[in-house]
Amino acid sequence: MATERKSRTKRAKKEETTWQERVIQIRRVSKVVKGGKKLSFRAIVVVGNERGQVGVGVGKASDVIGAVKKGVADGKKHLIDIPITKSNSIPHPIDGVGGGAKVIMRPAAPGTGVIAGGAVRTVLELAGVRNVLAKQLGSNNPLNNARAAVNALSTLRTLSEVAEDRGIPIQNLYI
């Protein structure tokens, strides 16, 4: 029984090491209270395993390290799974909205790379997408752009999912 427990904890630690995290922004924010201003830090963090799972998290704490840790935990709570094609791209063109930000993504040929800016680039890289074209419109806010990218990626569907929804075999999908 003790060995069972030991092996479970080792496996959990092994899974932990596969996650990568990148800090998009650290901002010092203040709250006005009776005694003056109370300073704290807000960290926006993207967490992904580069194999189709990614999440965006926000953490606030009185120190930077605490804010980043909370952001990583929040990102792991809000993970999404995305389908990635054999050419390490997305299956079809999509767009997503988060706040005032709009993100447009299109699949790209192998060797193109990730052509995107700012927070959207970070989200796509940590999701494991290697060939994609993306454009962010409407806002330069990193949090809204990251959330718009995650919203867009969450709407991706594979050919088999589309065929199943329509109730037809995959061979008859484009006939």
From Swiss-Prot:
GO terms for biological process: translation. GO terms for cellular component: small ribosomal subunit. InterPro entries: Ribosomal_Su5_D2-typ_SF, Ribosomal_uS5, Ribosomal_uS5_bac-type, Ribosomal_uS5_C, Ribosomal_uS5_N, Ribosomal_uS5_N_CS, Ribsml_uS5_D2-typ_fold_subgr. Keywords: Ribonucleoprotein, Ribosomal protein, RNA-binding, rRNA-binding. One of its GO terms (molecular function) is structural constituent of ribosome. Residues 19-82 form the S5 DRBM domain. Part of the 30S ribosomal subunit. Contacts proteins S4 and S8. With S4 and S12 plays an important role in translational accuracy. The N-terminal domain interacts with the head of the 30S subunit; the C-terminal domain interacts with the body and contacts protein S4. The interaction surface between S4 and S5 is involved in control of translational fidelity. Belongs to the universal ribosomal protein uS5 family. This is Small ribosomal subunit protein uS5. It comes from Nostoc punctiforme (strain ATCC 29133 / PCC 73102).
